[in-house]
Swiss-Prot record:
Binds 1 Mg(2+) ion per subunit. Its cofactor is Mg(2+). Keywords: Cytoplasm, GTP-binding, Ligase, Magnesium, Metal-binding, Nucleotide-binding, Purine biosynthesis. GTP binds at residues 11-17, 39-41, 311, 337-339, 419-421. Homodimer. Mg(2+) binds at D12, G39. It comes from Zygosaccharomyces rouxii (strain ATCC 2623 / CBS 732 / NBRC 1130 / NCYC 568 / NRRL Y-229). This is Adenylosuccinate synthetase. It is found in: Cytoplasm.
C-alpha cells in the first residue's frame, strides 16, 4: 500500500500535520523531491520538532524513513537537522533513516550561487520581480543534475580505492564551471573538500539503493506514506513558472523521485488551506491587499518556517484547486486552518477567471494573462463562532459544513479531514465513500 500526501496550492498548506496524524499507521515514510527548502513543525507530547529535509516519520518509533533519489541533500544541514531531533529525544533516528545512493548533493557553492541566479532570473520574469528562492541551493543543484554534471551520494561513499580521487575531480570541475559562470568567485574549496572527506564515512551507514529498498517494501506489502514537499502550484512544469521551485512537486515527482510505478499508488491526499497563501513573488489572483488579507495573515500566523518571510494571503481559489486536482488526481482532501475563518461574516471563494471579458476554461499557463484576470467570487455566509473545540464533523457549524460541501461539489473530491485549530489534535475526520 502506497499513499501520498501532496500540497494542492502554493505550499504551506499544513501537510506536516496530516502526515503527523497518519504516520503511526505506516511502516515506511518517504520523501521524493526537494531538499531543506521545505519546512513544517510537528508537536508530539508537547515537544516541537522542526522538519526541513528529513521525513516526518522519524517521530514514529516504528517507521523507517527514506530520502529518495529525487531529493537533493545538503549534508551539513542533514546532520544538523538530525542532531536537533536527537537532542529532543529521537535517539534512534539514525537507525531508522536512509538516503538514496542516487540522490544529488548540494554544496555550499550551490547556495552561494543561488542568490546570484535569483538576480539573473528576475530579468527573465514578466515583471522584473525576483523568483523568491529560499537561497538553499536547491535550484542550482537541480540545474547541475539536469546538465549531467551533478554529484550523487554514491560518488561520495563509494568504496573503490580511487573513489575519492574521482569525487574530488568531479567537485573541482563543477566548481570551475561556477567560477566561469560568475566571474570572480572566491571560495574555500579545500575547506569544503576536507569536510566531505569526513562526511564520506559519516554518511555511509545511511546510504541504500532506494529502488531496491522501495520495491522490497512494496513486495512485502508494507504500508508506505510518501510525504510531498512544496505543492503543485510550485511545480517546475505545472506551477506558475518561473515563480516555482526546481523539481516536480506533484504526483509525477513521486513516481520519478522514488522509482515506483503509478499502479502501486492507492490514495493521493490533497492538502488545501481554507484560504490561499503564497510566499515570494508571482501572480496571485485572489490575493487581498486590504484589511481582509491582513486579518488572514495575523490570525493564521502566516510566516514561513524555513525563511520567516510573511506570506501573502487571499481567498480560497477553486480554479487552482480544480487544476491541481486534474493533474494530481486526489482521492480525498484535507482542508486545513478552517478556524482562521471563524470571525468572518462573509467568505468569498474564487470560482472563475475572466480575461478580457471571456471566461477561461482552465488555469492559464501565461502569467501575463494570469496577472490580468478578473476573479468571479461566490460569497458564502460565515459561521462566526469558535470551532477549535469541535471534535466531530457533525458538530461543526452548519455554515462551516456548507463551506466544505461547496468545495467538494465544485472540485469533485470528498473532504476527509478538516483542520480546526493549531494543535495536532485539532483535526476532525469525516467519513467518506471510497470507490
Amino acid at each position: 500500500m502506497v499513499n501520498v500526501v501532496l500540497g494542492a496550492q502554493w505550499g504551506d498548506e499544513g501537510k506536516g500535520k496530516l502526515v503527523d496524524l497518519l504516520v503511526g499507521k505506516y511502516d515506511l515514510v518517504a520523501r521524493c523531491a526537494g531538499g531543506n527548502n521545505a519546512g513544517h513543525t510537528i508537536v508530539v507530547d508537547g515537544v516541537k520538532y522542526d522538519f526541513h529535509m528529513l521525513p516526518s516519520g522519524l517521530v514514529n518509533p516504528k517507521s523507517l524513513n527514506l530520502l529518495g533519489n529525487g531529493v537533493v541533500i545538503h549534508v551539513p544541514s542533514f546532520f544538523k537537522e538530525l542532531e536537533d531531533l536527537e537532542t529532543k529525544g529521537l535517539n534512534d533516528a539514525r537507525e531508522r533513516l536512509f538516503i538514496s545512493s542516487r540522490a544529488h548533493l548540494v554544496f555550499d557553492f550551490h547556495q552561494r550561487t543561488d542568490k546570484l541566479r535569483e538576480l539573473e532570473l528576475s530579468g527573465a520574469s514578466t515583471d522584473g520581480k525576483n523568483i523568491g528562492t529560499t537561497g538553499k541551493g536547491i535550484g542550482p543543484t537541480y540545474a547541475t543534475k539536469a546538465s549531467r554534471s551533478g554529484i550523487r551520494v554514491h560518488h561520495l561513499v563509494n568504496d573503490n580505492p580511487e573513489s575519492w580521487t574521482v569525487f574530488e575531480n568531479m567537485y573541482r570541475r563543477l566548481l570551475e564551471t561556477r567560477k566561469k559562470r560568475y566571474g570572480d568567485f572566491e571560495y574555500d574549496a579545500e575547506g569544503e573538500l576536507a569536510r566531505f572527506k569526513k562526511y564520506k564515512e559519516d554518511l555511509k551507514p545511511f546510504v541504500v539503493d532506494s529502488v531496491v529498498f522501495m520495491h522490497k517494501a512494496i513486495e512485502a506489502k508494507k504500508k508506505i506514506l510518501v510525504e510531498g514537499a512544496n505543492a503543485l502550484m510550485l511545480d517546475i512544469d505545472f506551477g506558475t513558472y518561473p515563480f516555482v521551485t526546481s523539481s516536480n512537486t506533484g504526483i509525477a515527482g513521486v513516481i520519478s523521485g522514488l522509482g515506483i510505478p503509478p499502479k502501486v499508488i492507492d490514495e493521493c491526499y490533497g492538502v488545501v488551506k481554507a484560504y490561499t497563501t503564497r510566499v515570494g513573488e508571482g501572480p496571485f489572483p485572489t490575493e487581498q491587499l486590504n484589511e481582509d488579507g491582513e486579518k488572514l495573515q495575523e490570525i493564521g500566523a502566516e510566516y514561513g518556517v524555513t525563511t520567516g518571510r510573511k506570506r501573502r494571503c487571499g481567498w480560497l481559489d477553486l480554479v487552482i484547486m480544480k487544476y491541481s486536482t486534474l493533474i494530481n488526481g486526489y482521492t480525498s482532501l484535507n482542508i486545513t486552518k478552517l478556524d482562521v475563518l471563524d470571525t468572518f461574516k462573509e467568505i468569498p471563494i474564487g470560482i472563475g477567471y475572466y480575461y478580457k471579458g471571456q471566461k477561461l476554461d482552465l488555469f492559464p499557463e501565461d502569467l501575463i494573462k494570469l496577472g490580468k484576470v478578473e476573479v468571479e467570487y461566490k460569497v458564502l455566509p460565515g459561521w462566526q463562532q469558535d470551532i477549535t473545540k469541535v471534535t466531530k464533523y457533525d458538530d461543526l457549524p452548519e455554515n462551516a459544513k456548507k463551506y466544505i460541501k461547496f468545495i467538494e461539489d465544485f472540485v469533485g473530491v470528498p473532504v476527509e479531514w478538516v483542520g480546526t485549530g493549531p494543535s495536532r489534535d485539532n483535526m476532525v475526520h469525516k467519513e467518506i465513500q471510497r470507490i
